[in-house]
Amino acid sequence: RPSTLKLVSSAPVAVSRAQSVGLNVKEGDLLTAGFESNYFDVVNFSHSLEHVYDPVATLQEARRILKPGGRVLLFLPNAGSAEAALFGDWWVAWDPPRHLFHFDRRSSARLLDLAGFQAVKTTTSTSKSSFLGSADCYFQYVAKSQRKHGSVLRHVAGVGCLVLGHLGYGGELKAMAEKPS
């Protein structure tokens, strides 16, 4: 069977634009999409699972529509990151009220387990723009400064973000899990 891309979005404007360029997009969420069982090789949640009301049920639905041995990919803000600890309430990825849930390595592993997946791999990374966005919030609201980041700080932040990501403390959590065969 040739590769098939199917998308689901709860944003009507995004759905309309995607459909206008020929993409196969359904409006709604995974729980209401009605995909057939054992159909997909991969289900990808890219910064979306933290927005759903029932992440366990959503992942259970992903498991249902995956073929045996199929994989689920999660890309999530990492509440256990050095960024979250450093910036506290000013970490940009808390993003209330849009983010209904926050995950770290342990809670994402538990979530995947509750949904019936077997964890394969978890890593982290940090983007310089996310890190500097948090720094901007901190300086503006806590330090009461409109300080802009110079090129030296941007380069230092870039190197720091790479190191934090490789050490497992990055601001983005990347988890891969498999539906048992």
What annotation goes with each model-predicted range?
Residues R1-W90, H102-L114, E172-P180:
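Conserved SAM-binding loop
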Residues L23, G80, W91-W94, R154, ...:
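Bulky hydrophobic/aromatic packing residues
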Residues S37, A93, S129-L132:
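A broad, structure-centric signal for solvent-exposed, well-ordered loop/edge residues
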Residues N44, A85, W90-W94, S145, ...:
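Generic, low-specificity signal for short hydrophobic/alpha-helical stretches with a mild N-terminal bias
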Residues W90-W94, D104, L112, A135-Q140, ...:
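Generic alpha-helical propensity signal that fires on short helical segments
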Residues D95-H99:
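A short acidic, glycine-rich active-site loop
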Residues R105-T124, V152-L153:
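A SAM-dependent methyltransferase catalytic signature shared across enzymes that methylate proteins
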Residues T124-S181:
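A C-terminal cap/extension of S-adenosyl-L-methionine-dependent methyltransferases
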